[in-house]
From Swiss-Prot:
Subunit (UniProt): Interacts with translational regulator CsrA and flagellin(s).
Function of the molecule: Acts as an anti-CsrA protein, binds CsrA and prevents it from repressing translation of its target genes, one of which is flagellin. Binds to flagellin and participates in the assembly of the flagellum.
A GO CC annotation given for this chain: cytoplasm
Protein name: Flagellar assembly factor FliW
Cellular localization per UniProt: Cytoplasm
GO biological process, one term: bacterial-type flagellum assembly
Keyword match Lipid biosynthesis: no
Lineage top rank: taxon: Bacteria
Family matches, as InterPro entries: Flagellar_assembly_factor_FliW, Flagellar_assmbl_FliW_dom_sf
Family note: Belongs to the FliW family.
Keywords carried by this UniProt record: Bacterial flagellum biogenesis, Chaperone, Cytoplasm, Translation regulation
Gene: fliW
Protein backbone atom coordinates (compact mmCIF):
# COMPACT_ATOMS: atom_id res chain seq x y z
CA UNK A 1 0.00 0.00 0.00
CA UNK A 2 1.10 3.58 -0.59
CA UNK A 3 0.35 6.46 1.76
CA UNK A 4 0.87 10.17 1.25
CA UNK A 5 2.90 12.11 3.78
CA UNK A 6 3.75 15.80 3.97
CA UNK A 7 7.27 15.06 5.24
CA UNK A 8 8.36 12.21 2.95
CA UNK A 9 5.94 12.30 0.00
CA UNK A 10 4.58 8.93 -1.15
CA UNK A 11 5.68 6.06 1.12
CA UNK A 12 5.28 2.37 0.38
CA UNK A 13 4.15 0.11 3.24
CA UNK A 14 2.90 -3.38 3.85
CA UNK A 15 -0.43 -3.77 5.64
CA UNK A 16 1.38 -5.46 8.52
CA UNK A 17 3.44 -2.29 9.05
CA UNK A 18 0.34 -0.41 10.19
CA UNK A 19 -0.22 0.13 13.90
CA UNK A 20 -3.86 0.32 14.97
CA UNK A 21 -4.53 2.66 17.87
CA UNK A 22 -7.33 1.49 20.14
CA UNK A 23 -8.09 5.16 20.72
CA UNK A 24 -6.59 8.03 18.78
CA UNK A 25 -3.65 9.98 20.13
CA UNK A 26 -4.49 12.72 22.61
CA UNK A 27 -5.90 15.55 20.51
CA UNK A 28 -6.24 13.32 17.43
CA UNK A 29 -9.04 10.96 18.48
CA UNK A 30 -10.24 10.26 14.93
CA UNK A 31 -6.87 9.03 13.66
CA UNK A 32 -6.39 5.32 14.37
CA UNK A 33 -3.92 4.04 11.75
CA UNK A 34 -0.25 4.99 12.04
CA UNK A 35 3.08 3.65 10.94
CA UNK A 36 6.39 4.09 12.70
CA UNK A 37 8.87 5.18 10.03
CA UNK A 38 12.60 4.81 10.50
CA UNK A 39 14.25 7.38 8.25
CA UNK A 40 17.86 6.25 7.67
CA UNK A 41 18.81 9.90 7.04
CA UNK A 42 17.75 10.86 10.57
CA UNK A 43 20.14 9.55 13.21
CA UNK A 44 17.96 10.53 16.14
CA UNK A 45 14.23 10.28 15.52
CA UNK A 46 11.75 7.84 14.11
CA UNK A 47 8.44 9.27 12.85
CA UNK A 48 4.96 8.25 13.94
CA UNK A 49 3.11 8.96 10.70
CA UNK A 50 -0.66 8.93 10.31
CA UNK A 51 -1.88 6.73 7.45
CA UNK A 52 -5.11 8.76 7.35
CA UNK A 53 -3.86 12.36 7.47
CA UNK A 54 -0.71 13.15 5.45
CA UNK A 55 0.16 16.26 7.49
CA UNK A 56 0.17 14.44 10.84
CA UNK A 57 3.55 13.00 11.85
CA UNK A 58 5.34 13.12 15.18
CA UNK A 59 9.04 12.70 15.90
CA UNK A 60 9.46 9.98 18.52
CA UNK A 61 12.28 8.50 20.58
CA UNK A 62 12.53 5.55 22.88
CA UNK A 63 12.69 7.15 26.35
CA UNK A 64 15.55 4.92 27.48
CA UNK A 65 17.80 6.81 25.07
CA UNK A 66 17.71 9.95 27.21
CA UNK A 67 16.24 8.64 30.48
CA UNK A 68 18.03 5.34 31.23
CA UNK A 69 16.04 4.77 34.43
CA UNK A 70 12.68 5.22 32.66
CA UNK A 71 10.06 2.80 33.91
CA UNK A 72 6.50 2.74 32.64
CA UNK A 73 3.85 0.88 34.59
CA UNK A 74 0.68 0.29 32.62
CA UNK A 75 -2.75 0.01 34.18
CA UNK A 76 -4.86 -3.10 33.76
CA UNK A 77 -7.06 -1.10 31.37
CA UNK A 78 -4.04 -0.16 29.24
CA UNK A 79 -2.89 -3.78 29.15
CA UNK A 80 -6.33 -4.98 28.08
CA UNK A 81 -6.74 -2.27 25.43
CA UNK A 82 -3.35 -3.17 23.96
CA UNK A 83 -4.04 -6.92 24.19
CA UNK A 84 -0.88 -7.30 26.26
CA UNK A 85 -0.31 -10.24 28.57
CA UNK A 86 3.09 -8.96 29.75
CA UNK A 87 4.70 -5.52 29.68
CA UNK A 88 7.87 -6.94 28.14
CA UNK A 89 5.93 -7.43 24.88
CA UNK A 90 5.55 -3.66 24.57
CA UNK A 91 7.78 -0.91 23.21
CA UNK A 92 7.56 2.65 24.46
CA UNK A 93 8.02 5.85 22.47
CA UNK A 94 7.99 9.45 23.66
CA UNK A 95 6.54 12.09 21.37
CA UNK A 96 9.08 14.88 20.94
CA UNK A 97 8.31 18.58 20.53
CA UNK A 98 10.95 20.48 18.57
CA UNK A 99 10.53 24.28 18.69
CA UNK A 100 12.35 26.78 16.46
CA UNK A 101 15.26 26.59 18.89
CA UNK A 102 16.05 22.84 18.94
CA UNK A 103 18.02 23.21 22.18
CA UNK A 104 14.61 23.60 23.84
CA UNK A 105 13.21 20.29 22.54
CA UNK A 106 11.23 18.21 24.99
CA UNK A 107 9.84 14.69 25.21
CA UNK A 108 6.62 13.52 26.80
CA UNK A 109 7.50 10.88 29.39
CA UNK A 110 4.11 11.03 31.10
CA UNK A 111 2.08 9.85 28.09
CA UNK A 112 4.19 7.51 25.95
CA UNK A 113 2.97 5.77 22.83
CA UNK A 114 2.94 2.09 23.77
CA UNK A 115 3.10 -0.53 21.01
CA UNK A 116 2.16 -4.18 21.35
CA UNK A 117 4.77 -5.68 19.05
CA UNK A 118 2.87 -8.89 18.32
CA UNK A 119 -0.70 -7.58 17.93
CA UNK A 120 0.39 -4.34 16.15
CA UNK A 121 -1.88 -2.36 18.46
CA UNK A 122 -0.87 0.92 20.02
CA UNK A 123 -2.14 3.40 22.53
CA UNK A 124 -0.99 6.64 24.06
CA UNK A 125 -1.08 5.79 27.76
CA UNK A 126 -1.19 8.44 30.46
CA UNK A 127 0.94 6.96 33.23
CA UNK A 128 0.04 7.35 36.90
CA UNK A 129 3.58 8.28 37.99
CA UNK A 130 3.47 11.99 38.88
CA UNK A 131 7.27 12.23 38.73
CA UNK A 132 7.22 11.85 34.95
CA UNK A 133 7.31 15.07 32.93
CA UNK A 134 5.09 16.02 30.03
CA UNK A 135 7.88 18.30 28.76
CA UNK A 136 11.19 16.68 29.69
CA UNK A 137 14.13 18.70 28.26
CA UNK A 138 16.24 16.30 26.19
CA UNK A 139 18.71 18.26 24.05
CA UNK A 140 21.54 18.23 26.62
CA UNK A 141 20.88 14.58 27.47
CA UNK A 142 21.12 13.57 23.82
CA UNK A 143 24.31 15.63 23.45
CA UNK A 144 25.85 13.92 26.49
CA UNK A 145 24.98 10.52 25.08
CA UNK A 146 26.79 11.34 21.83
CA UNK A 147 29.87 12.59 23.70
CA UNK A 148 29.97 9.54 25.98
CA UNK A 149 29.37 6.99 23.18
CA UNK A 150 30.31 8.56 19.84
CA UNK A 151 30.43 5.20 18.05
CA UNK A 152 26.95 4.13 19.19
CA UNK A 153 23.93 5.38 17.27
CA UNK A 154 21.50 7.43 19.32
CA UNK A 155 18.44 5.94 17.72
CA UNK A 156 17.69 2.41 18.80
CA UNK A 157 16.94 0.50 15.62
CA UNK A 158 13.51 -0.86 16.45
CA UNK A 159 13.34 -2.29 12.96
CA UNK A 160 15.23 -5.32 14.27
CA UNK A 161 12.17 -6.34 16.26
CA UNK A 162 9.64 -5.37 13.60
CA UNK A 163 8.29 -2.24 15.29
CA UNK A 164 9.52 0.42 12.89
CA UNK A 165 9.40 0.26 9.12
CA UNK A 166 12.41 1.30 7.07
CA UNK A 167 11.40 4.31 5.03
CA UNK A 168 10.81 3.55 1.35
CA UNK A 169 9.87 6.70 -0.51
CA UNK A 170 8.07 6.03 -3.78
CA UNK A 171 9.61 7.96 -6.67
CA UNK A 172 7.49 9.20 -9.59
CA UNK A 173 8.94 6.47 -11.82
CA UNK A 174 7.60 3.81 -9.41
CA UNK A 175 4.00 5.09 -9.41
Amino acid sequence: MIISTSRFGQVELKQEDVLTFTEGLLGFADLRKFVLLDDPNDEIFAWLQSCEAPAIAFPVLEPELFAPQYKATLTKGDMEALKLTAQDKARYFSIVTIPDDPTLMTANLKAPVVVNIEARTARQCVLQDNNLAIREPIFTKLQQRVVQNPAVAIKNQSTGIDVATKLHVVRDAEL
